[in-house]
Amino acid sequence: MARSSKMMVAARLLALALAVSTAEARNIKTTTTEKKDDAVVQPQTFPPFDRLGGGASPAFGGLPGGSIPGSSIPGFSMPGSGSSLPGFSLPGSGTMPLFGGGSPGFSGFGGMPGSPTAGSVPEHANKP
């Protein structure tokens, strides 16, 4: 009898150890699966630099789509940079003043405060 009771205790301990190890293995599997899910869903950087359609700083090695000089918008060019598409470029900086000043016919009117054209009108010249 003593022998069979020892066998029963050993069998129960073995079953308990097996149950604990199975539960441990299930926990390891679920944590591994959770880690895989976390690895699949990763936050993106903003803005996504690989989707931009224009020129970038040389630090990034340039981005695709920046074939028009001085512009990151396809078919549009900033003043003085030139454009391969006629009709989409702004006039060069020598033909139209961007920040006031007016044209030579209106030299005394318009302009930004403190600009050279502001001093050509006596009213502007007397202001502090």
Swiss-Prot record:
Residues 69-79 have a biased composition (Low complexity). The keyword Repeat applies. InterPro entries: MFS18. Residues 1-25 form the signal peptide. Residues 64-116 are annotated as: 8 X 4 AA approximate repeats. Sequence repeats lie at residues 64-67, 64-75, 69-72, 69-80, 74-77, 79-82, 81-92, 86-89, 91-94, 104-107, 113-116. Enhanced expression in male flowers. Accumulates in the glumes and in anther walls, paleas and lemmas of mature florets. Keywords: Repeat, Signal. The keyword 4Fe-4S does not apply. Residues 52-68, 99-113 have a biased composition (Gly residues). Residues 64-92 are annotated as: 3 X approximate tandem repeats. Residues 26-79, 99-128 are annotated as: Disordered. This is MFS18 protein. It comes from Zea mays. The gene is MFS18.
